[in-house]
Amino acid sequence: SIKGETYYVYSKFVKAEGAASSGDDSSTEESTQETSNVGEGKLICIDAGHQATPNTDTEPVGPGAEDKKAKVSAGNTGVTTGTEEYELNLEVALKLQSALEARGYTVKMIRTSNDVDISNAARAELANSDKADAFIRIHANGSTDTNASGVMTVCQTKDNPYNADIYDS
């Protein structure tokens, strides 16, 4: 649990057996969670989106693209909590790192500090240069719609104009 909220991850790469922990750090009971070694050394690259200081210089939105956007935007701030998105993203990413490593995965973190300057393109290049089996980008998007809730997952498709050729690989 993070700040009293529960989040779930679905992945063909994650398998747990036994009773799950409530995630409540205040509990004195030991977790009976047992994990298998499903990761078998697969490399997972985790990017905690954003950073303490945005970089408004621009870069292409994708490989070979003419359209450009800021290298790293500021992200959002929690309306209720006041937590900056880059802080929450790193907190979630570090918990995911621990969970994946406990399951036998090798994990590369794009950042382990908020005080970095790593562009979006550089983040993808780091995952690609290490030939990661999966690249997970953690974000906590916001909305001006007060009725909006839930989660969003974005994944590679064969229709991606920048890298559709790797869809089946």
Where would I find each of the regions flagged by the language model?
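Short, solvent-exposed loop/turn and secondary-structure capping segments
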Residues: Y10, N55-E59, N147-S149
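Boundary regions of SH3-family modules and the immediately adjacent low-complexity/disordered segments
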Residues: I2-S31
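N-terminal catalytic or cofactor-binding beta/alpha core of small enzyme domains
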Residues: N37-T112, A134
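Active-site-proximal helix/loop segments of hydrolytic enzymes
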Residues: T80-S169
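Solvent-exposed coil/turn segments that connect beta secondary-structure elements
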Residues: K3-E5, K12-V14, D47-Q51, T112-S113, ...
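A short, basic/flexible loop-to-alpha-helix module at the beginning of a structural domain
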Residues: E30-V38
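A broad, structure-centric signal for solvent-exposed, well-ordered loop/edge residues
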Residues: A16, S21, T53, N160-P161
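Extracytoplasmic
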Residues: G4-T6, G39-G41, K131-D133, A148
